Structures are given as C-alpha cells and as structure tokens.
C-alpha cells in the first residue's frame, strides 16, 4: 500500500543487484520487470505518487554514486524519509550524512519559477556539474502540477509552460553529454505534455475495490500492464 509520503517496500521484490537501471525497491520494480533505464524520462502521476522522487534520489546516489538533484514543486522533499530509508540499509551515520549531502534540493513555488528553473537554470547547473568527478546522475521533479492554477494563469499559458517543461526534461534525459543517467517527474493530475514526451508513464490510483494499483500507461513493450501495490 502507498501511504501519504512514501512507497512501502514490499517483500519478495527482486534485489537491485538482480535488476538493471534505477530501482524503486518496491513493487513498481515488478511492474516494469526492471528499474528505470538510462537516458529515459519517466513520468508518475496520480494522487498516491507522493514520495517517489525521494526514494529515487536516494537509490540513485546509493547505487550509481555521484549526486541527485531534486526540484521540489510539490513541497514533498523529505530528508527524514531519506535518512530513515538509508539507515535501514546503512547503519554508518557518516555514510548516511555523506549520502544526504549528495542530494541537492531546489524548491519552486510558482509555475514561472518552475519553468525558468527547468528551462534555463537547470541546464546550466548540469553543464557545469558534468565536469565534476561526482556529476549529477539523477534529476527529479516533484508535484509539477501543484504550481499551476487556472485562477492565476489562463489555460493556454499553462499548456504552453507545461509543454516547455516536458520538452526540456526530455532533452535533458536524452543528452548524454550532461552525464545525467535518469530523469523522473511526478504530478497528482495527469499532464498531457509529460505523457507525450515521457518514455515510461505510470499511473498510481485507488481501484474500485479500495486497493492501490499501478498501471503502465506508456511503455515500449509493456503498455497496459497493471499490478496491485
């Protein structure tokens, strides 16, 4: 079951060492049959996806080294969750502190801040960081739809800004020169442009039987596959 701020790791899921790519350490690995593939844009949406970026940022640093960059538009960045998850596997507090320092956080509060950061500032940060011995290998954007409101912006402007963000995240994912391996984004409500530009899209929802389920909405070979979480 997916709770408010995290996905609960499930027993019986294959270990990360038996998979390839960036894993979730929960049943989403079973849905995909593997982890997130390199140089892909993965999109997760639904009311119950809160917490995914925290876990992916943690697992990226833990399994692939380097750094993770968390763009928090949904106010869901949870260092305590990350600390708890890392401590479950690493009792060494020094190692945990080092891991936490490897996850950079940028908070945005408006749709224009998010658009400007993703389209202008983030590419510049990634370009500079690509020269580092510990480059950013994961970029995650949480709660993208949370900073958009039709009360503040006309629908046409919202559509245009979301399209620009989706295009740029897709470009970042495909650009091997920036040394970013994985890009993921979440929203509570479905954003059509993110769906169009993503390589993998997963909807997490509550079924009529009051159970949490995940469905592959976009995938090159497994589209339509569903599991109970």
Model-predicted segments: where are they?
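The Walker A/P-loop phosphate-binding site
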Residues: 1-91, 95
